[in-house]
A protein has these predicted regions:
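Conserved alpha/beta-hydrolase
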Residues: 82-98
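C-terminal catalytic histidine-bearing segment of alpha/beta-hydrolase fold enzymes
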Residues: 226-263
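Active-site nucleophile loop of the alpha/beta-hydrolase fold
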Residues: 155-165
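An N-terminal hydrophobic leader/cap segment in hydrolases
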Residues: 1-41, 46, 50
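Alpha/beta-hydrolase fold nucleophile elbow
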Residues: 123-134
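The serine-hydrolase catalytic nucleophile loop
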Residues: 67-80
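Alpha/beta-hydrolase active-site loop
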Residues: 101-121
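The feature captures the conserved acid-bearing segment of alpha/beta-hydrolase catalytic domains
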Residues: 179-222
Length: 263
């Protein structure tokens, strides 16, 4: 009964976390970057490595975006990382008609396989930053432990504090509670995963886009963990706007690859 209801609700939940589409928005060349597709198994997805020509790699970034089939839409928002001398790995998971349950289940499973593939490409001596947006932040949380001593830092942008609180904030006590119970009963909440990470600096960032209530961000801000810090971006500022918050994040990332200590 639970599974059949879950399959029904998955149609409603799909748009909460994912915006699948096949449109090509940007090419690496548009951003002045080199792009290389990594070979993967046919049922896993697509991995694209972005690099800045003639710049020696100082580290790598695995970027978990919040959709599927729209990898190229995220090239402009990650290109600045390449300017810092970082190799950026973007990926799309491959959806299948055979996928069952809620979208998050197949997302986590397939994301794990692609992260394994990406880590095979990164030299053991090179540091890796995990960065995720919305449900991509959960993917980053689930996979950062795979990098072990390579993990330089973790950035969680517009990350739900818990599945239940996110659903309740958006849908009220009735439907929200039912959906949260079915959606993520087999997964730990983001705040639980954050509390288990001890030796990796974490930056939780937030910008009000109407998708995630600020109450989720404020709950993280009340969390007293020594490796946790926060940046709130102005609500109306475009994604590529250079402001003091963006400069602060840039400096944090540079420090991630200089030292393992937090500010």
């Amino acid at each position: 009964m639970k599974k059949s209801f879950a399959n029904y609700l998955s149609v409603l939940v799909e748009d909460l976390f994912f915006s699948p589409e096949d449109q090509v928005y940007w090419s690496p060349e548009h951003a002045g970057l080199n792009g290389q597709k990594l070979p993967t198994l046919s049922d896993e997805g697509t991995v694209l490595r972005l690099t800045k020509p003639n710049i020696e790699a100082k580290g790598s970034v695995i970027y978990f975006h919040d959709g599927s089939k729209n990898l190229t839409a995220h090239i402009p928002e990650t290109a600045w990382l390449c300017e810092l001398g970082l190799e950026v790995y973007l990926f799309d998971i491959l959806e299948s008609e055979d996928d069952k349950g809620f979208p998050i289940e197949s997302y986590i499973r397939k994301t794990g396989k692609l992260v394994d593939r990406i880590l095979q490409e990164i030299p053991q001596e090179q540091k890796v930053l995990f960065s995720g947006n919305f449900i991509g932040a959960y993917g980053a949380l689930e996979n950062v432990s795979k990098a072990s001593e390579q993990a330089a830092g973790l950035i969680l942008h517009n990350c739900p504090y818990s599945f239940r609180s996110y659903m309740l904030a958006n849908y009220g006590p009735g439907l929200g509670q039912a959906m949260s119970a079915l959606l993520a009963s087999d997964y730990q909440d983001p705040y639980v995963l954050v509390s288990e990470i001890k030796n990796v600096p974490i930056v939780v960032t937030y910008q009000n886009t109407g998708r995630l209530p600020i109450s989720e961000f404020n709950k993280f801000r009340k969390t007293e963990l020594p490796n946790l810090s926060y940046i709130e971006f102005p609500a109306k500022a475009p994604a590529q706007t250079v402001n003091k918050e963006a400069e602060e994040l840039r400096e944090r990332i540079i420090k991630f690859f200089d030292t393992r200590t937090t500010s």
